[in-house]
Every structure is written in structure tokens, then in C-alpha cells.
Amino acid sequence: MKIAKLFISSVLLAALALSGCSPQDAAKPAAPAKQAVSVDVVAAQAKGFAVGAVMSANTVFVFFDPQCPHCGHLWEAAAPLQKKLKFVWIPVGWVNASSTPQAAALLTAASPAALMSEHEALLAGGKGGLSASSSIAPDVAQTIKTNTALLTSFGAESVPFIVAKNLKTGQTVSREGALETAALAEFLGLDAP
């Protein structure tokens, strides 16, 4: 009996360790043919907002849903690395009905980084994040749909989804889920801060 309880506990802990948010079943788009993850494709097709060392040649792309608490964790974990890297945060809308309006508010904000920090504090405080109008300009709604379609074209099943070139190997790396700062630095090939 103890072995069965231990096994079940282990399975539950493993599921929690994945640290990502998945789309609602009803909202999950049909899976198109999976394409190879490419920094160049993301740079050309996705739209988001940049934070960090904006002039850096090293860009880290992060697909996120505003309603995903794991994305908020990654937002905080990435902050110490922003002195050396440029992060482009690419909003998608798939966790719940608040996702797309909040993504639109972040994309159109005069200072998206400041609004993102405010939003993440509200979300972490259990307040659901920032208030956002459900009236979204068609071009902004299309941008979010394009970002979401690109994410799913890579076969991603949860956010945050990171795409970058490892600084040490030059290889494209990608992964789902949040990381602590040191693990994120290692994943990106950066010396720990």
C-alpha cells in the first residue's frame, strides 16, 4: 500500500515539475503539421515586446500566456539575465477567456515591460491580472492569433515556451516550462549571474 501511495505521489510531483500552462481543451487549436523550431522563423513571424539588452545580438524568444503563473515565474527568473540578453516576450491566447484581452493590452501598452510587471504582481496576488477590454483591434487580435498558431506549429503543448540560440554551442534550443535563473542561464549557454 505504501508503495502505491509513493508511486502516485511521485507521478503527481512529476506532473507539477513540468511547470507549464496548457490551453483549455475547447480552445486548443487543431494541431497542424509540426515544423522545426527556428529562431529565424520566430524572429520573422512572431510579434511581441522586447526587454533587457535591446541592442544585444543574442535574443531569447518567450511565448507566454498572460494567465499562466509559470510564465510569470519565468518573467521574474529572466530579470537578472536582462543585462546581457534581449528577451522578446510573445503573447498568445489559449489558457482562458482573459488571455487574449490581456495579451492585447500588453502588446499595445506604451510601456509593456512595466505593465507586464504590474500584471504579474496582480496575477501572483490572486487578482487575475490586469483588467483588459474585450474590445480588441482586428490587427492586434490577428497578431495574437498568428503568435498562437506559430507556437502550436512547433508542437508546443504548454507555455512558457522558450526559443533561443545557445551562446556556447550556437545551436537552437527550445523548451516548455519555467526555469529558475541559474537553470535558465545554463540552458541559454550563459554564465550564471
Question: Over which residues does each language-model region extend?
Answer:
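Hydrophobic transmembrane alpha-helix bundles
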Residues: A124-L130, G155-V163
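Short acidic-hydrophobic, aromatic-tinged amphipathic segments that line or gate anion-handling sites
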Residues: L106, R175-E176
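Charge-rich, low-complexity amphipathic helices
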Residues: I90, G128-G129, V173, L184
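Conserved segment of the thioredoxin-like fold in thiol-based oxidoreductases
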Residues: A97-Q142
